[in-house]
């Protein structure tokens, strides 16, 4: 049976995550309040941040930066925009 939650990011009832996606209290909080749809959107944004900012995930500072951005994305004022990213024009 699908676990339904009220997604804090999308402000609607949606399918919850299958397991906490991150360790610790932040992971538990995300698991309890973020939907699969919102998590997928974060993963796309996170990929843009890594690529555009040329982050090295072996660097502790880069991982801390992403954790901070993730918390801001879901529970704060929103994550940073990817520097240098220009959306395609059609």
Curated annotation (Swiss-Prot):
GO molecular function term, any single one: iron ion binding
Keyword field contains Iron: yes
GO biological process: cellular response to oxidative stress
Residue spans crossing the bilayer: none
Pfam families: Iron_traffic
Keywords: Iron
InterPro entries, alphabetized: Fe_traffick_prot_YggX, Fe_traffick_prot_YggX_sf
GO cellular component terms given for this protein: cytosol
Keyword presence, Signal: no
The family this protein is said to belong to: Belongs to the Fe(2+)-trafficking protein family.
Function per UniProt: Could be a mediator in iron transactions between iron acquisition and iron-requiring processes, such as synthesis and/or repair of Fe-S clusters in biosynthetic enzymes.
Protein name: Probable Fe(2+)-trafficking protein
């Amino acid at each position: 049976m699908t676990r339904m939650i009220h997604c804090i990011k999308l402000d609607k009832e949606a399918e919850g995550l299958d397991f906490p996606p991150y360790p610790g209290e932040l992971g538990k909080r995300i698991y309890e309040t973020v939907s699969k749809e919102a998590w997928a959107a974060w993963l796309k944004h996170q990929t843009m941040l890594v690529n555009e900012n040329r982050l090295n995930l072996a660097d502790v500072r880069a991982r801390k930066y992403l954790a901070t951005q993730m918390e801001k994305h879901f529970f704060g004022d929103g994550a940073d925009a990817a520097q240098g990213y220009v959306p395609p024009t059609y």
